């Protein structure tokens, strides 16, 4: 099965982010089309950026896309990908370092009941690993915990490889 992947970067990041581009490269090598929306203009508005506008931009990016669709994201990008999956039919979610809640917002991490893979750092200084373990356990999601911090900087290639295994398993 091949389709389209939309990869959402995190706060203080860009479409050229190392994890986003590594995942895009793997997806393309497997025959998937990809896009990485740019949220930098929205992220400059406050400490957490404009979350609701990010969600709306991702929804618009999905309009008219061919299926199957997979959403991937890192940190805030993971959060909005999960939230958008509640409104748009997707085949799967690949979430890296997803926050389970956002300070100052009355929304928590929720996602459609679709195949989901999560990669999270044991030493994440922003989002405690235990919160993500509890969230993933409630959903019986595939969760990989790695010896890394929030940015998963030491596991970029691992994340890309894990993504490749994930999309190859979508059948």
Model-derived features with residue positions:
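A conserved short beta-strand
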Residues: 89-101
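Catalytic histidine neighborhood in serine/cysteine hydrolases
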Residues: 33-35, 137-152
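Active-site loop->helix "elbow" adjoining a glycine-rich segment at hydrolase catalytic centers
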Residues: 74-78
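Short beta-strand/loop motif that positions the catalytic acidic residue
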Residues: 112, 118-120, 124
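Post-His helix in hydrolase/transferase enzymes
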Residues: 21, 153-168
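Serine-hydrolase catalytic machinery in alpha/beta-hydrolase-like enzymes
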Residues: 2-68, 80-83
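Conserved alpha/beta-hydrolase fold motif
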Residues: 70-71, 93
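Conserved alpha/beta-hydrolase "acid-adjacent" motif
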Residues: 16, 125-131
């Amino acid at each position: 099965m091949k389709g389209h992947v939309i990869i959402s970067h995190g706060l203080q990041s860009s479409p050229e982010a190392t994890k986003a581009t590594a995942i895009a490269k793997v997806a393309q090598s497997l025959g998937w089309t990809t896009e990485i929306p740019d949220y930098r203009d929205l992220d400059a508005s406050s400490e957490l950026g404009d979350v609701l506008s990010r969600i709306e931009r991702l929804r618009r990016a999905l309009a008219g896309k061919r299926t199957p669709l997979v959403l991937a994201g890192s940190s805030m990008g993971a959060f909005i990908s999960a939230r958008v999956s509640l409104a748009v039919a997707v085949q799967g979610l690949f979430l890296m370092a997803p926050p389970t809640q956002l300070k100052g917002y009355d929304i928590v991490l929720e996602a459609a009941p679709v195949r989901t893979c999560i990669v999270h750092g044991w030493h994440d200084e922003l989002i405690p690993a235990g919160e993500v373990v509890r969230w993933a356990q409630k959903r019986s999601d595939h969760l990989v915990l790695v010896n890394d911090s929030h940015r998963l900087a030491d596991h970029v290639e691992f994340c890309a490889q894990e993504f490749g295994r994930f999309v190859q398993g979508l059948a």
